[in-house]
Regions:
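His/Asp/Glu-enriched, well-ordered alpha-helical/loop segment
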Residues: 203-235, 286-287, 308, 312-314, ...
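Histidine/acidic residue-rich metal-binding segments in metalloenzymes
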Residues: 134-314
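C-terminal cap of metal-dependent C-N hydrolases
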Residues: 8, 328-332, 388-454
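Divalent metal-coordination and catalytic microenvironments
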Residues: 8, 26, 49, 60, ...
Length: 460
């Protein structure tokens, strides 16, 4: 039987309009006025007054990742379950082979981690932490497997590659129509600052984390990457962008005619660096991530850039650890596992701040959470839009379902949320994944029906 969502407002990147939505199997059949004869053959679901968003897409998650001598709290089962509960119907995680391992090995390993365990659809980026003829020879096979986006690091010794390797990789990806997202921080200077902080007796202070990784060292790496991309004549994505200085470097590159896409995250939009100054170690350590959370002024700059279309996507960089795992760094801040849970709360936090504080329109929220990620990562128009022929991935967002976020209520195994005590403006009521009801009344009612997505090329 078909499903008819009646009485809602369909949200797109252009705004919202009153429209009913008819679902047939996994696809949207039509929207607008549904003929009575079709309505009579359908299960009618009353969504009066609710916003109907295209399923949210989180293009930056780290599930079941070994890091800092431990493993993230969330695997693909718990991570994807939290994702679907929060309205995210697609995640794109990172396959991460170690240096010396093949890309094919990394892809196979991540399929073993994810296949058959996901409550939402999923895809992979491929991490490039080494560059040689062997790695380059594997690129065509990655594209055949539906991997068209890649990740590189300008920091972390175990994962970073040199500037020359970045240049060669960008050129190789451009030829194939691929694109790279890059983590931009200046590794060498950060290491020196860490050594200085420890020598001055501040090695156990959580606040040493943001002090060691200031905004200008992120901006320097952004600038360097963009000059490398200019030399390679290749597009790039700056992931988890946090500050005004980096945005200035990106604006300069665009004035030169470069193609640059920008991602930010809810923690950089709704929190500020005051979280690191809590005298209680556990309270401060839970916010340790890289790059660090920045100032209120940086948050305002990011919102302004979102309004102007200068930042295209909001992902989470979900990389969760329990507070017990965070305690590994009680005597040495560099041993605190870096990362936050966020995949379950992204939609509600972004919607609330955007609408309550007039930061972003409904259309802007849809572009950042759904439409632009789908276009950027080769999923549009199958995903990212409610239109005839698209997957029936639909978030029913009820403006009357406000609630307070508490870590104890989260599905994440981290056991906490960085947005503890945050009151939402409305909430996710129902979620459909390819036409099947996965969330009802804010509770996951469906199973592990997530499918692997072979993605096309960037169309943003």
């Amino acid at each position: 039987m078909k499903t008819l969502l009646r009485g809602g407002y369909v949200v797109s990147g252009r705004g919202c309009r009153r429209a009913d939505v008819l679902i047939d199997g996994e696809k949207v059949e039509m929207l607008g006025h549904i003929p009575p004869e079709l309505a009579a053959q359908s299960e009618v679901v009353d969504v009066t007054g609710c916003m109907l968003f295209p399923g949210f897409i989180d293009a930056h998650t780290h599930f079941d990742l070994d890091v800092c001598s431990t493993t993230t709290a969330d695997d693909f089962e718990s991570g994807s379950k939290g994702a679907i509960r929060g309205g995210t119907t697609t995640v794109i995680d990172f396959a991460c082979p170690n240096k010396g391992e093949s890309l094919a090995y990394g892809l196979d390993l991540w399929h073993k981690k994810a296949d058959g365990k996901c409550y939402c659809d999923y895809g992979f980026h491929m991490t490039i932490d080494d560059w040689n003829e062997s790695i380059e020879s594997e690129l065509d096979a990655m594209f055949d497997a539906g991997i068209t986006s890649f990740k590189m690091y300008l920091t972390y010794p175990a994962m970073m590659i040199g500037d020359g390797a970045v240049y060669r990789a960008l050129k190789a990806l451009k030829v194939r129509g691929g694109i790279a997202g890059v983590h931009c921080e200046n590794a060498g200077v950060i290491d020196e600052r860490i050594a200085e902080l420890k020598a001055s007796g501040l090695g156990a202070d959580v606040v040493s984390h943001p002090i060691s990784r200031p905004d200008y060292l992120e901006a320097e790496a952004v600038s360097r990457l963009l000059r490398i991309a200019q030399a390679a004549d290749a597009p790039v994505i700056i992931v988890h962008t946090t500050n005004r200085a980096s945005l200035d470097e990106i604006a300069a590159a665009r004035r030169r005619g470069q193609t640059v896409y920008v991602e930010t995250c809810p923690q950089y939009l709704a929190l500020d660096d005051g979280v690191y100054y809590d005298p209680d170690f556990s309270s401060a350590a839970r916010y340790v991530c890289a790059p660090p959370i920045r100032s209120q002024e940086d948050s305002e700059a990011l919102w302004k850039a979102l309004r102007r279309g200068e930042v295209q996507t909001i992902s989470t960089d979900h990389c969760s650890f329990t507070l017990e795992q965070k305690d590994m760094g009680r005597d040495d801040f560099t041993k605190i596992p870096g990362g936050l849970p966020g995949v379950e709360t992204r939609g509600e936090v972004v919607y609330t701040v955007a609408i309550n504080e007039n930061k972003l329109s409904l259309g802007g929220v849809c572009r950042a959470l759904s439409e632009n990620p789908a276009k950027l990562y080769g999923l549009y128009p199958r995903k990212g839009v409610i239109a005839a022929g698209s997957d029936a991935d639909i978030v029913v967002y009820d403006p009357g379902a406000s609630h307070v976020l508490h870590g104890a209520d989260m599905l994440s195994k981290a056991g906490y949320t960085p947005f503890e005590g945050f009151r939402t403006n409305g909430g996710v009521s129902k979620v459909y994944l390819r036409g099947q009801l996965q969330v009802d009344g804010g509770k996951v009612v469906g199973g592990k029906m997530g499918e692997y997505l072979k993605r096309g090329k960037c169309a943003l």
